[in-house]
């Protein structure tokens, strides 16, 4: 994976969004990788997840506006649906998920 890292420390799974040059903005690839990472978590090996962003400037700067400006209407709708699906998966994940917010936490 290019933009998501996952590591286990003891009984804690740590997911890091790793696009610090783009302030960890969410693009299609980040959403796909985050979705796949959540699916791959061994829920018997960890007791909780920490979600954080790489670097000190930004946790997540919202959606990647650069990518969004290139999408067709249908692609934009699919991007929005994918984002909603991934966020719903985080909200309903069977383990506690802690957001370790470092820097900006923006929506959009």
What are these regions (language model features)?
Residues 44-45, 71, 93:
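Structured helix-beta-strand junction loops
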Residues 89-108:
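Glycine-rich beta-to-alpha active-site loop
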Residues 3, 21, 25, 32, ...:
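Residues at secondary-structure transition points
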Residues 53-89, 105:
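Glycine- (often His-adjacent) and acidic-residue-rich active-site loop
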Residues 26, 65, 101:
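Hydrophobic pocket-lining residues within nucleotide cofactor-binding pockets
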Residues 18, 63, 102:
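Histidine-centered beta-alpha loop that forms part of the nucleotide-sugar donor binding/catalytic region
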Residues 1-52, 88:
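Conserved CoA-thioester-binding segment of acyl-CoA-metabolizing enzymes
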């Amino acid at each position: 994976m290019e933009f998501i890292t996952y590591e286990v420390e003891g009984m804690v799974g740590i997911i890091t969004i790793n696009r610090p040059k783009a302030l960890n903005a969410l693009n299609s690839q980040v959403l796909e990788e985050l979705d796949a990472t959540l699916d791959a978590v061994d829920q018997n090996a960890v007791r909780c997840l920490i979600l954080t962003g790489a670097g000190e400037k930004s946790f997540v700067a919202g959606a990647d506006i650069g990518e969004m400006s290139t999408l067709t209407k249908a692609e934009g709708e699919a991007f929005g649906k994918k984002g909603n699906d991934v966020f719903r998966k985080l909200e309903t994940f069977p383990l506690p998920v802690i957001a370790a917010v470092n820097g900006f936490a923006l929506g959009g």
